[in-house]
A protein has these predicted regions:
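Domain-level recognition of nuclease-like catalytic cores that cleave nucleotide substrates
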Residues: 29-34, 38-84
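Conserved catalytic cores of phosphodiester-cleaving nucleases, focusing on short active-site segments
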Residues: 1-8
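Residues in well-ordered beta-strands of folded domains
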Residues: 5, 19, 36-38
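Active-site-adjacent loop/helix micro-motif of nuclease/hydrolase catalytic cores
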Residues: 10-21
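Solvent-exposed, flexible loop/coil residues
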Residues: 20-22, 27, 61
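Accessory, usually C-terminal, subdomains that scaffold auxiliary metal cofactors
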Residues: 13, 24, 42-45
Length: 84
């Protein structure tokens, strides 16, 4: 079984938000979890782009007092790959 967490942002956005629960779930699912980033282009869906990132949240240490994280879009985008 695979799980995909989808985050879409308007083209040019600098950050995206991910909750502590989403991070924890991704970390427990390991290779069964993918983060899908959707770059939504203002010129329409023909210009949208998608990147898949595996083990996207492995570098984050969860904190019980933190409910969400603002992550740098560019950092994750550069780690991803387009769909096959």
């Amino acid at each position: 079984r695979s799980y995909i967490e989808v985050k879409g942002r308007i083209h040019g956005s600098e950050t995206f938000t991910v909750t502590a629960n989403e991070i924890q779930f991704g970390q427990t699912q390991k290779e069964h979890h993918k983060l899908a980033l959707v770059d939504v282009h203002p010129d329409g869906p023909d210009h949208d782009e998608i990147r898949y990132i595996t083990q996207a949240f492995d570098h984050i240490e969860s904190n019980v007092t933190t409910q969400s994280y603002n992550e740098k879009w560019r950092d994750y985008w550069s780690r991803g790959a387009p769909p096959l």
